[in-house]
Amino acid sequence: MRIETLLYVYLFICSGMIVFNIITAIVLKRRDRRTVRASARFRQHILQQIERINTGQQVERRHKKYLSRLLTRTGNMIAFDKMLEDLYREEPRQATEYLSQLGGVIVYLTIRYGRKDRIEAAYFPYIIKKYHLIENRPFSGVVDAMYTLLRESSIYCRENAMQALYTTGDCDCIMKALKILDGGESFFHEKLLADGLLEFTGDHEVLGRCIEKSFADFSPEMQMAMMNFLRLDSGEHCAFALALLQNTATDDEVRYACIRYLGRYPYGPAYETLLELAECRNDARWEYAAIASTALCAYPGDETIERLKRNLYSRNWYIRFNASKSLERMGLTYLDLIDVMEGHDRYATEILRYRFDIRNLTQKEAEQECTS
């Protein structure tokens, strides 16, 4: 009897799930149909305004009121977004000109969406970023609303607000936004910031100078994100990175980021510092030697090779691994490292043999691809 009861309960749950899936599919299908119909209505109205633009006229005031009224509903905004995607594929120049005349509508909608639920509030900054609605014209009302969203606990609000601000092309806006994030209590991953800053539509050289100028005003976590951005962006900040690296008061994580920067962009004056850091004199600070062993790959030479060969005998696995990887990437062969390969340190020999085996396998795979 107990087994039969369990079977009935199981069948009831399965039936409920099937009914739920059917209802959900019906609701979503009806919603898609409404979105298509709404997109068609928007398209009809907007094509009329584009005809006016083509004849040298402005977008009608009543059309702006029409948009301000309807687009406050998220469902209509989704339909508007779908219509704009199609319009940009067909007539990109006219679509851009049309949107450029909706400044007042954008400000109004930004304020209205800022009062909505946090998920809905995060949606409009996504639209701003997608169509570059404030590129080279950062309306104060819109920018202030984005600053407000940066103080929210929702990661969607903060990330989408930053994405919108990247399109302003205004370095001052970005620096203020970074300070707001830095002063907030919510965690914001440095990779999101480093990758996001690469999408900045303004002058990256000017932004880099602004970062250097205000660098000391930020927390170590934000400084690390900034250094990662500079590393991915350009090699114009080598002197700045070296100065930070040589300053022992700089946070360790920031100094690690500086070593990686100098490993990506070889800088002569940094060579001696990197050689010194690659020598592990303190097991408690092995990270410097490990990261510097990787960076030295960009500084080939006899001193570099000798330093890396000595690191193959380190007690720390990461130091040995990075040193072997750098030696292999520098193109050294078995014969060049015969003294290590035929030496008495089994760990040094094994890690080099591993690197050479990996290189040989990669070369064989490449040859097979060429012949096939």
Stretches found by the model and what they are:
Residues 1-40:
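N-terminal signal-anchor transmembrane alpha helix of single-pass membrane proteins
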Residues 26-115:
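N-terminal topogenic membrane-targeting module
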Residues 43, 63-64, 80, 255, ...:
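Short amphipathic alpha-helical segments that mediate assembly, nucleic-acid/protein binding
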Residues 64-68, 100-113, 136-149, 171-181, ...:
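Amphipathic alpha-helical scaffolding segments comprising HEAT/armadillo-like alpha-solenoid repeats
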Residues 82, 86, 90-100, 122-134, ...:
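Structural detector for internal amphipathic alpha-helices that build alpha-solenoid repeat scaffolds
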Residues 111-199:
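Long, acidic/polar, low-complexity amphipathic helices and coiled-coil-like
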Residues 116-117, 153-155, 184-187, 218-219, ...:
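Short inter-helical turns and helix N-cap capping residues of alpha-solenoid HEAT/ARM repeat scaffolds
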Residues 154, 333-372:
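Eukaryotic acidic, Ser/Thr-rich intrinsically disordered low-complexity regions
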